[in-house]
């Protein structure tokens, strides 16, 4: 699912509340219709074995990445979560 910047940040916040790890974020451009991913706007954060205590930090970094991408003109995002 492609997400608006606001929705992507909301997904990160909800993931933190539910204890879900954000594995990656891919930024791109919404073309109406369609989505063009930009491989230079891809963020990943390796999940350590003892990841539960690091979920807040992981999700904070994910949100910071989205905000940086917004400043660089990206308008849509795909988020990959670890259930």
Swiss-Prot record:
SUPFAM superfamilies attached to this UniProt entry: ImmE5-like (SSF143469)
Top-level taxonomic group: Bacteria
Keywords linked to the UniProt accession: Bacteriocin immunity, Plasmid
GO biological process assignments: bacteriocin immunity
Coiled coil: none
Pfam family, one: ImmE5
Gene3D superfamilies reported in the protein's UniProt record: 3.30.190.30
Role description: This protein is able to protect a cell, which harbors the plasmid ColE5 encoding colicin E5, against colicin E5.
This protein's name: Colicin-E5 immunity protein
Lineage per the UniProt record: Bacteria, Pseudomonadati, Pseudomonadota, Gammaproteobacteria, Enterobacterales
Encoding gene (name): imm
């Amino acid at each position: 699912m492609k997400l608006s910047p606001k929705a992507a940040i909301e997904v990160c916040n909800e993931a933190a509340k539910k204890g879900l790890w954000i594995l990656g974020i891919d930024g791109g451009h919404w073309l109406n219709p369609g989505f063009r991913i930009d491989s230079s706007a891809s963020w990943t954060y390796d999940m350590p074995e003892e990841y539960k205590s690091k979920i807040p930090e992981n999700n904070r970094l994910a949100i910071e990445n989205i905000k940086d991408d917004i400043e660089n003109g990206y308008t849509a995002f795909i988020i990959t979560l670890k259930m």
